[in-house]
Each structure stands twice: as C-alpha cells, then as structure tokens.
From Swiss-Prot:
GO MF term set: DNA binding
Keywords recorded for this protein, A-Z: Acetylation, Cell cycle, Coiled coil, DNA synthesis, Isopeptide bond, Nucleus, Phosphoprotein, Tumor suppressor, Ubl conjugation
Coiled-coil annotated spans: 354-413
Taxonomy of the source species: Eukaryota, Metazoa, Chordata, Craniata, Vertebrata
Stated name of the protein: Protein lin-9 homolog
Pfam family, one: DIRP
Phosphoserine PTM sites in chain numbering: 65, 95, 309, 321
Keyword Membrane among record annotations: no
UniProt-annotated stretches for the region Sufficient for interaction with RB1: 2-296
Length: 542
C-alpha cells in the first residue's frame, strides 16, 4: 500500500502525457519523481513488473539525470519481438486467373492462324526450305555491304556518329520499289541456281560463288521426311515423304501423309526436311573434282541390229510401241546418239524397277497387316500366307531379271568408259592400283622396321597387303565424294580375289571377320551415291 501511495494519481499522469506530447515537462513533475528514476529498472525477459523508464529532456531527447548518482545498468535493453513472416503459398484459386488468361490468348491465337492471310504470313515469316535457309538466315544486306566496302574493318563496336558516317558513305538504299523487288528476285534465283550446281558437282572452280554462304546444304534423298507447301485447292504446309528427285527441273516428288492429298511435284525451294539438314563447306566442292560426264556426247558406236529381236517380240510394252518399226529396222543404227540395244535395256530396266516398286509397296502393306493381326493375337490365314509367299517369289524373280539387265547396261558403260577417261572392265581401276601399291609399301615398311623381316612367309605378307589395300580403297571411296560405279565395284572384285586365294578352311573365317563388315560399309556408301544396284554381285552373266 505504501508503494501505491507513492505513485502519482491519474490526473497528474494525464497531465504528464499531455506535456510530453507538447514537448515540455513541468519542473514539478521532474522534481517529484526524480528520486524514483535515478535507478531505472528494466524489464527482463521473464519478469512481468511495470517498466520504469528514465525521464527525457523534451528538447534534446537525452537522459536528464545525474550520472554520478545514477547506477548504469549493464544489461542490454529488451529488444522488440520480431514478427515471423510466414510465406504464403499460392493456392489454385490465385493461379486460376493466369491460366484462364493463357487459355484465352491461346484460343485467340488459334483463331488468328485460321485466317488465310495470317497463315500465309506465318509461312512467309518462318518457313524456309533447305536451299533458302542459308541464304535468308545468314548475314543481311548491310553486313554483306559492310564487308565489301570496308574489308579492313574488324570491329563492330562503333559510336553512333561513326555508324552514321558509314551509312552516308554507302548511300541511301531505295526499297519497296518495283525495280528493287525485281532485282532481289533475280538475285535470289541466281543464288539458288548456283547452289544447285554445287549440289550436283557441275562446277570445278568455286571462285565465282563468293556471294554464297560458307555452308552449302546437301540435296535431299529419297525417303526423307519433309514438310512441303501445296498450292491451289489445298493451300498450306503438309508433311510427307520424298519418292523421287528431279535434278533437271529442281523438283521433288512428294507423297503426302494426309489422306486425299496424294503425290505432287514440289519445287525444291518449297520443301523443308523434318530432320536436321546436312551441310558442306563451299571449299570442299572445289576439291577432288572429277570430270563430269553429264554434258559429254556419247560415242556413236557402230551397231548392227538383228533382223528379229526376241526382246521386242516377247515384251508387250515394246511390242505395242509405235517405235517398233523404227527400232527393228535395219536403217537405224543409233537413236539419239545411243545404240538401240542399249535403249531397249534401259526401257526394260525402268519397267522392272516400276514393277518392283509396286511389289515392295504391297509387301509393306502386308507386313503392317501381319503385325496388326499378331498384336491382336489373331491367327494368320493360309490365304494370307500364300499371297505373301507369292509376292516374295515374284520379287526374287524380279531381282534376277534386274541383275541380268543391269549387267548388260553395265557392259555398255564399260565400253563407254575408255572414251570418258576411265579404265575398261578387264583392267583394275586406277584407284585400286594406287591403293595396292601403297598397301604393299606400308606392309613392307612395317615388316622391316627392326631391320629383319617379322613375317617371312610371302603368302602372309601378300594377304596382309591385300587386306590393307581394301581399307585404303574404302577410305578413298568415302573421301572421294562423287562415287564412281566402276571404282565402287572394284572393292567387290578385290574381296573376290582375296577369297579365291585363301585356303578353303579359312573361307568361313574370312566371311565372318572381313566380308560381312565390308558389305555393311558398301551398303552405307551405296546409299550415298545410289550405286547399290550397280555394285551388286552379278551372278547371271549369260
């Protein structure tokens, strides 16, 4: 009770608060309660007593007490309790508006792309064919002009004044005029034609192609999955597969995946490969060039046709042809600069390939049907097996006929070879001869590296030399670029020569360790140059 009597009454406390707010304390207040504030009592962490704060000077906010009489407390004052900020998790209700907005934007974008003009705008803006991609995605006209006008300018970090000076020196370009558009179209056509010539290896000097990019795209091959543009009724972009390549007209024959579109001939500047396109440095086209036989006139060999040709009589296609009288006549020895017999074999070859393509298509459809039946655990009928076996037997017979015709066509090519600077059929090619000589030198040097021959048996050293020559031939064929059918077939001839010299007990080992691997390499090389048919072993040589 004594302590309660010493406390000020409520009215005096209110006056003190008002005076504190006004910025001054009365002297009576300070004198009356100075004794109570000499030793301030700070509230501890676990105490619940009232806090007795020292009075402050309203002017300078300093402790107004006698430092000599007041005992300084060394304990640190109580810190304000920090309010822990708990991160709020975004609930589904908070992200719902964003999701709805995204869906709304997606619907609007889809509706926009349905418009014909918007669809064409997307095609013009982002669809670039393989032949146009390096032309449009390379350096722009300003960069090209900068390289030509200022070849010694190595930096691109210039000030605004310096860039303005360069633009004034270049002159102001006139764009969006009829003359400008005509000039741009003409330049684009010329660059496309130059790329086609490089793709077909019809140039020997690449100094005239400095305006082209450094990387030239390779031509697309048969079987490539592509996206092509159709015009007319079905105007738009559609996926499909290349079935044929026409280098003369620079077009591709594309069979589209969508039902009802069928097969169309599409120019190469409207066909884009779905797979990453392969490129080749432009400098590589000027290396190891071989003389092109495309523009050479075939020799007019003396040819005397027989009075009656069994091929014409037995072939229904040639038998009904209006050219039969001219072909079988004794007055005509050549037709278009080619012997008639050669043209007949080429016609038969084209016919057999067309029939074989149809059989392969039927076989593919039957394989799909068989896989479907197997997936449903359904039995395969006897009729289905009979039809499948019939197609397989017909394909086997077609392959035999194809080998016969190919052999006859190849024989004519052998006769044509000396006039084109190649070796005839009964002589090894120059590449094979060079590889054999280099292989013998390598084996001889490796065998006598220590001063004494490591292998004294001549048959073994000869076998090692021939096997090394095969490796060198494969290397030359892979680096040659433009594959030659005669040099390609020389690889098979080298294998046959080695196989004929080894012992019969080692033939199985040779087939498993050498021949099968070379066959895989031949398959890959033949796909590069489309020489698989001419490189096949022709067993029917009648």
């Amino acid at each position: 009770m004594a302590e309660l009597d010493q406390l000020p009454d409520e009215s005096s406390s209110a006056k003190a608060l008002v005076s504190l707010k006004e910025g001054s304390l009365s002297n009576t207040w300070n004198e009356k309660y100075s004794s109570l504030q000499k030793t301030p009592v700070w509230k501890g962490r676990n105490t619940s007593s009232a806090v007795e704060m020292p009075f402050r000077n309203s002017k300078r906010s300093r402790l107004f007490s006698d430092e000599d009489d007041r005992q300084i407390n060394t304990r640190s004052p109580k810190r304000n309790q920090r309010v822990a900020m708990v991160p709020q998790k975004f609930t589904a209700t908070m992200s719902t508006p964003d999701k709805k907005a995204s869906q709304k934007i997606g619907f609007r974008l889809r509706n926009l792309l349905k418009l014909p003009k918007a669809h064409k705008w997307c095609i013009y803006e982002w669809f670039y064919s393989n032949i146009d991609k390096p032309l449009f995605e390379g350096d722009n006209d300003f960069c090209v002009c900068l390289k030509e006008s200022f070849p010694n300018l190595k930096t691109r970090k210039l000030t605004r004044v310096e860039w303005g000076k360069i633009r004034r020196l270049m002159g102001k370009p006139r764009r969006c005029s009829s003359a400008f558009f005509e000039e741009e179209r003409s330049a684009l056509k010329q660059k496309r034609q130059k790329i086609r010539l490089l793709q077909q290896r019809k140039v020997a000097d690449v100094s005239q192609f400095k305006d082209l990019p450094d990387e030239i795209p390779l031509p697309l091959v048969i079987g490539t999955k592509v996206t092509a543009r159709l015009r007319g009724v079905h105007d738009g972009l559609f996926t499909g597969q290349i079935d044929a390549v026409d280098t003369l007209n620079a077009t591709y024959r594309v069979t589209f995946d969508r039902t009802g579109l069928g097969t169309h001939t599409i120019p190469d500047y409207e066909v884009l490969s779905n797979e990453p396109h392969e490129t080749m440095p432009i400098a590589a086209f000027g290396q190891k060039q071989r003389p092109s036989r495309f523009f050479m006139t075939p020799p007019r060999l003396h040819y005397t046709p027989p009075l009656q040709s069994p091929i014409i009589d037995n072939d229904p296609l040639l038998g009904q042809s209006p050219w039969r009288s001219k072909i079988s006549g004794s007055d005509t020895e050549t037709l278009g600069g080619f012997p008639v017999e050669f043209l007949i074999q080429v016609t038969r070859l084209s016919k057999i390939l067309m029939i074989k393509k149809e059989h392969i298509k039927k076989l593919r459809e039957m394989n799909t049907e068989a896989e479907k039946l197997k997936s449903y655990s359904m039995p395969i009928s006897i009729e289905f097996q009979r039809r499948y076996a019939t197609i397989v037997l017909e394909l086997e017979q077609l392959n035999k006929d194809l080998n016969k015709v190919l052999h006859k066509v190849q024989q004519y090519c052998y006769e044509l070879a000396p006039d084109q600077g190649l070796q005839p059929a009964d002589q090894p090619t120059d590449m094979r001869r060079r590889c054999e000589e280099e292989a013998q030198e390598i084996v001889r040097h490796a065998n006598s590296s220590t001063g004494q021959p490591c292998v004294e048996n001549e048959n073994l050293t000869d076998l090692i030399s021939r096997l090394t020559a095969i490796l060198l031939q494969i290397k030359c064929l892979a680096e040659g670029g433009d594959l030659n059918s005669f040099e390609f077939k020389s690889l098979t001839d080298s294998l046959n020569d080695i196989k004929s010299t080894i012992d019969a007990s080692n033939i199985s080992c040779f087939q498993n360790n050498v021949e099968i691997h070379v066959a895989h390499i031949q398959s890959g090389l033949s796909q590069m140059g489309n020489l698989h048919a001419f490189a096949a072993n022709n067993t029917n040589r009648d």
